[in-house]
Amino acid sequence: AIFAPLLLLGAEAEAATETAPIPATRTAPVEDTAIQQLSMEFRHPVADGTLMRMICLIDVPAKNALSAEELRARGIDGEHFITCLGEFVGKEFADGRFQDIAEHYVPWTEAREADFRAMLDAHNLAAENDYGARAETVQNPAYNIVIAYQSGHSLHITSAGAALNEHENAVEDAVLTWVDDAFATGGKQTP
């Protein structure tokens, strides 16, 4: 299954309404160079394990992200690889087993990247940068977000633990609302 290897990079929800900006403890500008790598992991406890959503930039055959009509309209060969925002939803059971639930892909475009940057800026998420320190020490955080820019700079946003405080809940809600909206506007889903 494709899901287990993505855990090393360290998941389905209805589209949510727009969220209010997160109160800032400090401000930081959003990097203005192209995003080279994006990896986000969200973990939510359920009765017999953990529901996980992994969202990342990934190159996939265009047929995985676009309908046959869209491929024809754009003149793209379905086997041609394109960069997409990919989502992998799965469950890790308490006994260590994994179950893949769904995959979603939507093309990563300049407009989508600009929209992502606007969300980061609107919620002052660059100020949440912990420079990877939490990811080094927190086991199974509720969320772990890594954005690497072509400039060589990166943004690391990791929750302080498996349970979210009010501020961390607002961070997660802002990002997942953007993700849900991105997938609601196009792309394909594989159950």
Which positions does each model-derived feature cover?
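Boundary at the C-terminal end of the N-terminal hydrophobic targeting segment
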Residues: 10-15
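Bacterial N-terminal signal peptides
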Residues: 1-7
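N-terminal glycine/threonine-rich, aromatic-flanked beta-hairpin/loop signature
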Residues: 66-94
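A short-motif feature that recognizes glycine-rich, charge-decorated loops
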Residues: 87-127
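Short, well-ordered, aromatic-rich surface patches in folded extracellular/luminal domains
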Residues: 16-71, 104, 119, 123-191
